[in-house]
């Protein structure tokens, strides 16, 4: 069945609603970034930000020309890795939307989602990939539709180091 999968990203400082068709077409996303006054991310404050911006982001999504709630066939959400309080907000919003729309709820690994979007957009077929994003730096192998982490940083991810 062709339709749209609504994705919810809430692993850390960004809260987003994104869309992808069941045929792989990407649509513009709607995001809000938590910016602490100083220092790094404060997980509870970031989660509060996500809760406070949910309505605004959903309104922006609803008002976009190419969007219809009737086209949603599933709701996907980042279930980890990420910051616990932030992940809980995303999961709660996803469960609510899934229930209201009577569509399946799909928990997604945040790292795998990054990789799969990249593979979808580039046609990459390489069996071994280097994944670098925020707090995650991993060497990952893909075989038979599954991923296996071959190695990863133990102290700090390259993305965090660069931040």
Predicted regions and their residues:
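Short acidic/glycine-rich loops and adjacent helix/strand connectors
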Residues: 1-163
């Amino acid at each position: 069945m062709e339709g749209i999968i609504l994705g919810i990203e809430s692993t850390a400082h960004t809260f987003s609603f994104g869309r992808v068709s069941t045929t792989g077409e990407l649509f513009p996303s709607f995001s809000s970034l938590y910016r602490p006054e100083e220092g790094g991310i404060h997980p509870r404050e970031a989660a509060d930000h996500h809760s406070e911006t949910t309505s605004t982001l959903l309104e922006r999504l609803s008002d976009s020309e190419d969007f219809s709630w009737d086209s949603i066939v599933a709701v996907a959400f980042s279930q980890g890795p990420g910051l616990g309080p932030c992940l809980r907000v995303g999961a709660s919003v996803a469960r609510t939307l899934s229930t209201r729309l009577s569509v399946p709820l799909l928990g997604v690994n945040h790292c795998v989602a990054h990789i799969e979007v990249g593979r979808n957009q580039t046609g990459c077929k390489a069996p071994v990939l280097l994944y670098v994003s925020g707090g995650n730096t991993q060497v990952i192998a893909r075989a038979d539709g599954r991923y296996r982490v071959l190695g990863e940083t133990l102290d700090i991810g390259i993305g965090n180091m660069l931040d």
